[in-house]
Regions:
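Conserved core of the sugar-phosphate nucleotidyltransferase
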Residues: 132-196
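Short beta-strand/turn micro-motifs composed of small residues
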Residues: 9, 27, 53, 125, ...
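Conserved beta-strand segments of alpha/beta enzyme cores
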Residues: 22, 79-81, 182
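Residues that form or immediately flank small-molecule/cofactor binding pockets and catalytic motifs
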Residues: 28, 85-88, 188-191
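Glycine-rich N-terminal loop/short-helix segment of MobA-like nucleotidyltransferase
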Residues: 1-28, 44
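Active-site metal-binding loops of divalent metal-dependent hydrolases
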Residues: 12, 127-128, 160
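Conserved N-terminal catalytic core of the sugar/cofactor nucleotidyltransferase
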Residues: 2-7, 31-123, 130-131, 135, ...
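Short glycine-enriched, charge-decorated loop/helix-capping segments at active-site entrances
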Residues: 20-26, 96-100, 170
Length: 196
């Protein structure tokens, strides 16, 4: 069964002086975090990659990663597609409040994929590293998807202290679960720092 990896890469990048933070080199040969995530996902069995970006960063994004990844993936039989997050893309019956200038975030980003994704999929942030094991577990879960159980969902959660940076405060989604281990909410929390 085909499985897709959706990579949210539309971040404004204000922490990087207005640049595209997802394109910052971290590896010894200029690799970016997405290179590692895409490699791990393909190794785990994902065969479609969908980048969620903004129209205004499309050219820079494709120059920095998209075109290169498309060439690599073409030789591996992995499909590449793009979805575009835009402020005005809201569900039918809704409108953008007057004065709002920024897109809505994760939910709206995933909504941008409507019509592009037909297969089971996983969603990741472009600038977070998840590790091979997370992609293997997600792919294995998605392989068990059946259309008669469309509500089957999974989340690769991480212990908060293991996701903190040595280089200052971070923002994380703190997941809340009920007694049956179902996700009941996500609280976006800013300014989280390691303590001694």
């Amino acid at each position: 069964m085909k499985t897709a990896l959706v990579i949210m890469a539309a971040g404004i990048g204000s922490r990087f002086g207005g640049g595209i933070k997802q394109l910052a080199a971290v590896g010894p040969n200029g690799e970016i975090i997405m290179d590692y995530s895409i490699h791990d996902a393909i190794e785990a069995g994902f065969d479609k990659i969908v980048f969620i970006i903004r129209h205004d960063i499309e050219e820079a994004f494709k120059e920095a990663i998209g075109d290169r990844i498309e060439k690599i993936c073409a030789g591996l039989g992995v499909e590449i597609d793009y979805a575009f997050q835009a402020l005005e893309n809201v569900p039918e019956g809704f409108s953008v409040p007057e004065g709002r200038s920024k897109p809505w975030g994760t939910g709206q980003a995933v909504l941008a994929c409507k019509g592009i994704i037909k297969e089971p999929f996983a969603v990741i942030n472009a600038d977070d590293y998840y590790g091979k094991e997370a992609f293997v577990r997600l792919h294995d879960f998605l392989q068990g998807y059946t259309p008669d159980k469309p509500g089957d969902l999974a989340m690769a959660g991480f212990v908060l202290k293991n996701t903190l940076s040595d280089n200052g405060a971070v923002t994380r989604g703190i997941c809340q679960m009920n007694d049956a281990h179902y996700l009941t909410g996500v609280l976006e929390t800013s300014g989280i720092e390691k303590t001694a």
